[in-house]
Amino acid sequence: MIVVDAATGRVLSEDNPDDVSPPASMTKLMTFAVVADKISSGALTRETLVKITNEDSKMGGTQVYLDARETFSIDELLYAMMIQSANDAAHAVARVSAGSVEAFVELMNAKARELGMTHTTFRTPHGLPPSSRLKADGDLTTPRDYALLCRYLLFHTNVLQYSSVQRRDFGLNRKQGPQHMRNHNNLLGKIAGVDGLKTGYTASAGYCLSATAERHGRRVIVVIMGSFGPNGQRDLGKTRDLKAIELIERGFTALASSLPNNLATAMNAPTAAIPTVKTFESAGPTPEQSSTPRADGFTFRVAPPVKKP
């Protein structure tokens, strides 16, 4: 795990941050980064329409059940990818963005090299493990590398517009009615300042989370990988979430040491506890609730350059 000051990249806390393991659906953060670059360059727009193919619709795992007879905008698919963690949506945007999924994965790895993610290799746009290949043939990264990616996303894309949304309907015009999506990030709306970024889980990856929170103009990034419950059991991410809460508070405590006393006191004010952490990694649909976007369009922000923590 690693805790980083988002503004400077300074490491505030770490524990085996260079251990290599699968990121699971956190892979979709790099997919978002590459699509954001395409939109910023003018190669795509958020309104670009994507005709779904049979290949898109055959993705397993978490999905929005795309059908080859359907068409959706890039924007709709990005919401599905970031909120529902939809593998079929990730596959569709990757295919359209680069002409093929294989070409898109090459762009993902090029972006990783650009950001200095030296222990990262991507092989999919969604993070699903290979069904019949060795573990080494799947997506691999480290908490330190993913902190670099998170900083890039925060400073150079509008990722928070998507990652901060707790609930949203997908496919409003579908004949069968919309799918009610609920964000898998259980800290949203419960822990002060949390507005992203992405969870992940597979049997080999364990429970993963790239989280970020902002308080009084200061922001921390927390990356946790390979979390399991007691005795290595599945716990729907409860252990991961409780650890993330602890690390977020630890990060703000470290940042507060450099602030004036009044701001330090405010930053360290107690936040609402989570007596029972409800998890939605495999949960079913929930009612739609509206959410106001934080930004409009993929625009670059003025921020410090991305540096390796």
Locate each region found by the language model:
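Active-site-adjacent loops and short helices of periplasmic peptidoglycan-processing enzymes
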Residues: 1-144, 154
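Domain-terminus/edge residues, biased toward the C-terminal soluble/receptor-binding domains
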Residues: 121, 134-309
